[in-house]
Amino acid sequence: MTTSTPTSRTSATTSTPGTADLTVTEVETIPYRKPLAFASGSVSVAEHVLVRVRTAGGLVGVAEAPPRPFTYGETQASIVAVIQQIFAPAVLGTDALHREQIHARLRRTVGNPTAKAALDMALWDVIGQAFGRPVTELLGGYSDRMRVSHMLGFADPAAMVDEAERMRSTYGITTFKVKVGRRPFRLDVDVCRALREHFGDAVELYVDGNRGWTPSEAARALDAMADLDLTLAEELCPADDVLGRRWLVRHTAIPTVADESATTPGEVTREILGGSADAISIKTARTGFTDSRRILHQCEGLGVEVVMGNQIDGQLGTACAVAFGSAYDATTRRAGELSNFLDMSDDLLTEPLQIQDGTLAVSGRPGIGVTVDEDKLEHYRVDL
C-alpha cells in the first residue's frame, strides 16, 4: 500500500550532495513472506513488511519491520495499517531532516515499535543518500564492521555443539547466544556444559531465557552453570515481573540483560535505576536509529553495557543493525547478534551480506547502502 502527495520530482543522481529536496512525498508498505531454511515447530516463514520512503528529490529510503505479535502485539496487517492510516499522513510533506519533528508526531501513537522503527530508518537512509555518506558515519563513524554472535536454538546438546562448530568453521563466529528457558532447567544446563566442554575457552557463551523461567528457576539454573564462564544472562524471567527480576539481579554475579523489558528510553531508566538489569539489549528493529541512539547515550551516562540484539531480522534489517552498531565504541565492544538472516533460505538484497572471519562489514555506500531486488520482492510479497 502507498500513501503519497502529488509533487514534481527531479533526478537525485544530478543533485549535489546535501541539496536534494528531502520533502517526503510517498510512504509505501509491502508485506512479504520468506521461507526459513532451518524451520522448526510452528515457525516456517519470516513475515516482514518492507517500508519505502520517497522524497521530492527522487531519493528512496528502505527498511523492514519484523512483527512479533506475541511480544509487541504487532502483525503484518497492523504495521501496514498504522503506517498508511496514521504515520504516513503525519510525515508527508515534511523534510526528512526534521527528525525531531517527525519523532514527536510518531510518538503521539502508543505502541507499534517496529512500524515506527522501520519508518525512522528509511528516513535516515534517505538522509545518508542526500549527503552522499553512509548512515554509520552520520551516526558516529566509529568502525566499519562488527563482530558477530550466533544464536543457538533449542536442541539436544550434540546438535547444538554441531551447529556451533559449523558456524565457527564456516563463518569464523566464536560468540554464541544460547537459548534457554525450558523445564526442567537441567535440559539447558546440559547444553551449555556440552558447549563449554567442547570448545573450552575458545568461544564466548551467554544465555537468553526469552522470559521462560521464574526468578527461582533462573537462580537455580545460573547457580548450576556458575562454572561455565557465561558472560551475560538475558531476560530469563517475565518482562512484567519487575520485582522478580530485581531479586534475580541481586542473587547472581552474571550481568543481567534487559531486552523485552526495556524497549523504550523510559523503560531503560526504570530497569537500570530500579536494579532490575545490569545491561541493555538495543534492537534497531524496534527503536530505529533515533531511539536506539537515545538509549545508547542513556546507558553510556549510567555506565551500563549494551549489546546489539536481533529480531529475526532479514538482511535488510541486519544491514540497519550493523550500521548502527558499528557507529559507536560502546556498541562494538561486544559481538552483535547479526546472523539470524542465515536461517532464511533467500532474501531481498541484490548483494547479499557476507559474514567473514567472524565479522560483518557495513556497506560503504551512502545511506544504509543496500539495494532491494525488485524481482525477489515481487516473488515474496503477499496480499493481506
Regions found by a protein language model. Give the residues of each.
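Structured beta-strand/loop patches that form or line metal/cofactor-binding pockets in enzymes
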Residues: 2-3, 14-72, 343-346
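N-terminal amphipathic alpha-helix/helix-capping segment at the start of soluble metabolic enzymes
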Residues: 14-26, 40-42, 107, 128-129, ...
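Metal- or metallocofactor-binding catalytic centers and their adjacent structured scaffolds
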Residues: 21, 26, 54-130
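Conserved, mostly hydrophobic/aromatic
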Residues: 51, 58, 87, 119, ...
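Metal-dependent enolase-superfamily TIM-barrel catalytic cores that perform enediolate-based chemistry
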Residues: 137-252
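Shared catalytic-loop signature of beta/alpha-barrel
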Residues: 229, 240-255, 262-359
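C-terminal extensions of enzymes
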Residues: 343-384
